[in-house]
């Protein structure tokens, strides 16, 4: 064990004032004063303030027995806050340390905390820690360790430990400057004067958690909070005032978002306190945060106006009412009069017309004009379920995700159910696996406006541009997945058998090119090989299905130009994919990028 002689002298050898307020405390105060006198750090003053005790002079006799070892003051009864204020006004130290008359300091309490100050650049930091809980006779009950409740980094976020009930006033070592800058204890509050003042001070002061247990806190029936009848009501009022006074920035700093802070505060109050009114207020405020959150729904449109109108109507019936719809007309050639008429009827719908440049450019225009906190994408031929935005918004706020997607239903051209796709199981840290398997469907995606402002769709890509962006986002962020079908994705032709192999193959090659052409993503090029190998397998299955169908419809297949074209594209696609795989393996990434571009011009 290191002795005091072995320890270096404190560079910062400041005077610390230990203030002991007492009312009728002759039973315990001697232990408290003795623990203060036993401090290994000697540059201290001990101030005992008798708050008008009515115990036939017992409290005063105990205090006077210490002579000039302590500074003793007597005042008329005014409550704990008034006694502390009296001591503060008479203290000479640069730092304040509160010791309740029924609590006990460990001998190294002050020295240890001053040592911590020596290691910190900012000497205006408040030091605090956990404590040992003891009974009336001084027997240990248990240890209260804040670091078992919150991670260390959160314990150093001003206000958060206080609002999770983790601050014991007697564990603090606090610069006295804050009494001059912020104020002293509110003497009108009999039992909550401490948290009231800590709240005000912690809003402006840095804090530092130390895991050492340095105080013993006595739990007994004579404590003020147990004897004062309106304690719970006083606490309800105090906590409600906290919730009203906190700024959005403070809530974000503590828990990542106002919604998350409010719901976690409600959970804390419900599980750890009887303060029902404050708990109900936190829940009400959390719901209001969701209601006040605007969602920007971006719908690119190119012809198929009847489907686009269906898509718009699926947004208009959302249970979450705070939204805007951005219709991006990507140079439609069909009659759009019915579409524009709907847009003019609802102020929440904004209509933009642009020349045809593809879905990526259309979505980017929507992103640049969006004003919501979150963006949700909806293709003009797809649909939202009515609670889609409500469920996804709550999920993202509760889990602090900046990007999420959900499972979905496939429907045919007439809106009939085909199957469920449980893509929402694809969640968490999905990179680099997302390169070879990206199940994220466009109308299931929601993300923050900031995320998409910083990550626009690649406009030079018209097929596979969505997967390219999802891969890029997943390489830097965790992906939130909801395994609940909240959107309907329309499949042209009603079945995957008739998908466009041309578009499919171009999309795969575009994704491969995008990955290989990115300095960071290209490090994971083997995943593109796996992606293309999987594509070959899928195309082979497609070809087999077509062959089976052809046998039962020989004359139809012989005379159908579209079917013959699909078969040709399937063959060309497999050739291109296999050439890509061979090129990556034999010639490397850069040569493959150049070759891909030549393939696209020659074969597609």
Swiss-Prot record:
<dbReference type="GO" id="GO:0016758">
    <property type="term" value="F:hexosyltransferase activity"/>
</dbReference>
<dbReference type="GO" id="GO:0009058">
    <property type="term" value="P:biosynthetic process"/>
</dbReference>
<keyword id="KW-0808">Transferase</keyword>
<dbReference type="InterPro" id="IPR029044">
    <property type="entry name" value="Nucleotide-diphossugar_trans"/>
</dbReference>
<keyword id="KW-0328">Glycosyltransferase</keyword>
<dbReference type="Pfam" id="PF00535">
    <property type="entry name" value="Glycos_transf_2"/>
</dbReference>
<protein>
    <recommendedName>
        <fullName>Uncharacterized glycosyltransferase RC0461</fullName>
        <ecNumber>2.4.-.-</ecNumber>
    </recommendedName>
</protein>
<comment type="similarity">
    <text>Belongs to the glycosyltransferase 2 family.</text>
</comment>
<dbReference type="InterPro" id="IPR001173">
    <property type="entry name" value="Glyco_trans_2-like"/>
</dbReference>
């Amino acid at each position: 064990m290191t002795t005091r002689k072995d320890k270096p002298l404190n560079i910062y050898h400041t005077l610390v004032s230990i203030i002991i307020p007492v009312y009728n405390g002759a039973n315990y105060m001697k232990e408290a004063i003795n623990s203060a006198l036993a401090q290994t750090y000697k540059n201290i003053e001990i101030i005992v303030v008798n708050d008008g005790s009515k115990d036939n002079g017992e409290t005063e006799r105990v205090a006077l027995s210490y002579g000039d070892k302590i500074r003793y003051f007597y005042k008329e009864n005014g409550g704990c806050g008034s006694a502390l204020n009296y001591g503060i006004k008479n203290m000479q130290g640069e730092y304040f340390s509160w010791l309740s008359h029924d609590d006990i300091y460990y001998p190294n309490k002050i020295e240890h905390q001053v040592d911590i100050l020596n290691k910190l650049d900012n000497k205006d930091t408040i030091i605090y820690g956990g404590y040992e809980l003891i009974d009336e006779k001084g027997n240990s009950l248990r240890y209260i360790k804040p670091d078992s409740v919150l991670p260390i980094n959160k314990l150093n976020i001003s206000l958060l430990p206080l609002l999770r009930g983790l601050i014991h006033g007697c564990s603090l070592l606090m610069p006295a400057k804050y009494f001059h800058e912020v104020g002293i204890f509110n003497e009108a509050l009999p039992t909550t004067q401490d948290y009231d003042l800590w709240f005000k001070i912690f809003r402006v002061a840095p804090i530092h958690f130390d895991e050492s247990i340095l105080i013993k806190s006595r739990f007994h029936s004579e404590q003020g909070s147990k004897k004062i009848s309106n304690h719970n009501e006083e606490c309800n009022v105090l906590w409600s005032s906290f919730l009203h006074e906190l700024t959005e920035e403070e809530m974000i700093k503590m828990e990542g978002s106002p919604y998350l802070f409010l719901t976690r505060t409600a959970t804390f109050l419900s599980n750890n306190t009887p303060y029902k009114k404050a708990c109900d207020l936190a829940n009400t405020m959390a719901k209001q945060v969701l209601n006040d959150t605007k969602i920007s729904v971006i719908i690119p449109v190119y012809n198929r106006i009847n489907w686009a109108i269906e898509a718009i109507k699926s947004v208009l019936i959302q249970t979450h009412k705070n939204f805007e719809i951005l219709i991006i007309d990507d140079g439609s050639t069909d009659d759009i009069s019915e579409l524009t008429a709907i847009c003019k009827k609802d102020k929440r719908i904004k209509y933009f017309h642009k020349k045809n440049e593809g879905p990526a450019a259309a979505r980017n225009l929507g992103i640049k004009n969006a004003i919501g906190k979150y963006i949700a994408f909806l293709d003009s031929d797809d649909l939202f379920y009515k609670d889609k935005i409500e469920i996804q918004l709550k999920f993202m706020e509760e889990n602090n995700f900046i990007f999420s997607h959900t499972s979905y239903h496939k429907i045919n051209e007439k809106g009939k159910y085909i199957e469920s796709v449980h893509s929402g199981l694809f969640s968490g840290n999905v990179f680099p696996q997302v390169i070879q398997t990206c199940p994220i469907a466009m109308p299931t995606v929601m993300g923050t406006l900031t995320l998409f402002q910083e990550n626009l769709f690649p406009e030079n890509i018209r097929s596979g541009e969505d997967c390219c962006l999802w891969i890029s986002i997943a390489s830097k962020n965790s992906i939130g997945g909801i395994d609940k079908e909240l959107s309907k994705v329309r499949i042209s032709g009603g079945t995957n058998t008739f998908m466009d192999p041309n578009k499919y193959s171009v999309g795969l090659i575009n994704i491969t090119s995008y990955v290989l052409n990115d300095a960071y993503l290209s490090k994971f090029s083997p995943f593109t090989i796996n992606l293309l190998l999987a594509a070959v397998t899928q195309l082979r299955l497609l070809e087999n299905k077509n062959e089976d169908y052809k046998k039962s419809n020989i004359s139809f297949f012989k005379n159908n130009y579209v079917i013959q074209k699909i078969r040709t594209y399937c063959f060309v696609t497999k050739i291109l994919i296999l050439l890509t795989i061979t090129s990556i393996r034999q010639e490397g990434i850069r040569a493959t990028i150049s070759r891909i571009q030549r393939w696209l011009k020659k074969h597609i």
